[in-house]
Amino acid sequence: MAESPIVNHPEQGLCRDCLSLQKTQTSRRCHACGSPRLIRHKELYRLSLAHVDCDAFYASVEKRDNPDLRDKPLIVGGGKRGVVSTACYLARIHGVRSAMPMFKALEACPDAVVIKPNMEKYARVGREVRQMMRDLTPLVEPISIDEAFLDLSGTERLHKAPPAVVLARFSKRVENEIGITASIGLSYCKYLAKVASDLEKPRGFSVIGEAEALDFLRDKPVGMIWGVGKAFAAKLESDGIRTIGQLQTMEEGALMKAYGTMGQRLYRLSRGQDSRKVEPDHDMKSVSAETTFNTDLSAAGDLVPVLRALSEKVSRRLKAGEIAGRTIVLKLKTQDFKLRTRNRQLGDPTQLADRIFRTGLQLLEKEMDGTRFRLLGIGVSDLSPSDRADPPDLVDIQATKRAVAESAIDRLRNKFGLNAVETGYTFSKGNLARTQTPTDRDNEP
């Protein structure tokens, strides 16, 4: 549990604009500046675990850099054959969503402006936001380029303010100095901090306290459980489980018998129990990506393109973080929810999609015995700085050529978008590799 034990503040509110503490509980506006942007919660000054998520990050950066786009629906993504990377909130009103095929997005919002992603620029802005987070606490755990968990417990004396006030200051600083907005979720555990940050986007600041957790979760759909994608939610619904409240009435043993290790997660998170600590990025143990399929798959022609797409996703994160890993880990879940993990250690650390994929493929081929799989994942562990990664292969000249080609592809994708270049593995099965992903989790412990 992440709470601030130092000061018992009598005030129950905070103004997000002037940052004054609110002593009255009935006023709808700040007593100091008149702003309606007030936060009130009984545990506001005790909680210290936060999830920070920049709002429509890619689109917000583009609108910041081009004021002419401010009042226009904006989609960041590939061409007509590509997919949406992100969309501004004006476009979302029309039904545009991330990962939507571009032609469908333009059907939903024909007046949208489409911009190809500039990953170098987004990474640069992401690093600026990350540094501001580290100014608050050393306990920053990045989840992606634009979001992270922060543990501010024990920082009240340093900042001379409780974590809620420090986070509100941070939000204003990001808006004023970087020119984009962020939403904040404050709670006592990672799971509910993440849930809270999604409640009032954009420019949100939501709080979920420990005392209210069970009641808050009771009527929520099972899809709100971290790690429950569309396919698994459909499975639970077919078993008669639609709400988190139903999970709260079930025994842990029964859930584990029905759903394996995922049953334990369902039991604990449905009760707001999440003991995971915030782990700083320099202690990150692995980088991974996984997908749960709409339909259980067994054929190589279906599995291999997805493995390639996931390998490229892991590779992008390694390169963005300037890290590499020495152990490749393959993760499979069978149709009866049994988990298989296989790993292989490399001679040198890697961040190349080609090496990750080819090693993962060797592991996957040994498991393709007709078994149908509902989940496929690939990851890299034993992480280290990338300065010693992927030395030239003096034996396998083709591997060196593939590494050079991958570097060229990276430059093209950074300039023109992720779908500017596709490999032979993903091109013919592109729709499967890109859209068969109702559950897509990264770095799950």
Swiss-Prot record:
GO cellular component terms given for this protein: cytosol
Group of enzyme by EC: transferase
Site (Substrate discrimination): 58
Record keyword Ubl conjugation present: no
GO MF: damaged DNA binding; DNA-directed DNA polymerase activity; magnesium ion binding
Classification via InterPro entries: DNA/RNA_pol_sf, DNA_pol_Y-fam_lit_finger_sf, DNA_pol_Y-fam_little_finger, DNA_polymerase-Y, DNApol_IV, IMS_HHH_1, Rev_trsase/Diguanyl_cyclase, UmuC
Biological process according to GO: DNA-templated DNA replication; error-prone translesion synthesis; SOS response
Primary site of residence: cytoplasm
Enzyme Commission code(s) on record: 2.7.7.7
Superkingdom in the source lineage: Bacteria
Binding site for Mg(2+): 53, 146
Cofactor(s) needed by this chain: Mg(2+)
Domain UmuC: 49-229
Residues at the catalytic site: 147
Entry keywords, A to Z: Cytoplasm, DNA damage, DNA repair, DNA replication, DNA-binding, DNA-directed DNA polymerase, Magnesium, Metal-binding, Mutator protein, Nucleotidyltransferase, Transferase
Cofactor: binding comment: Binds 2 magnesium ions per subunit.
Compartment(s): Cytoplasm
Keyword Lyase: no
Catalytic activity: DNA(n) + a 2'-deoxyribonucleoside 5'-triphosphate = DNA(n+1) + diphosphate
Family designation: Belongs to the DNA polymerase type-Y family.
PANTHER family documented for this protein: DNA POLYMERASE KAPPA, DNA REPAIR POLYMERASE UMUC / TRANSFERASE FAMILY MEMBER
Quaternary data: Monomer.
Entry protein name: DNA polymerase IV
Protein source organism: Brucella melitensis biotype 1 (strain ATCC 23456 / CCUG 17765 / NCTC 10094 / 16M)
Gene name per UniProt: dinB
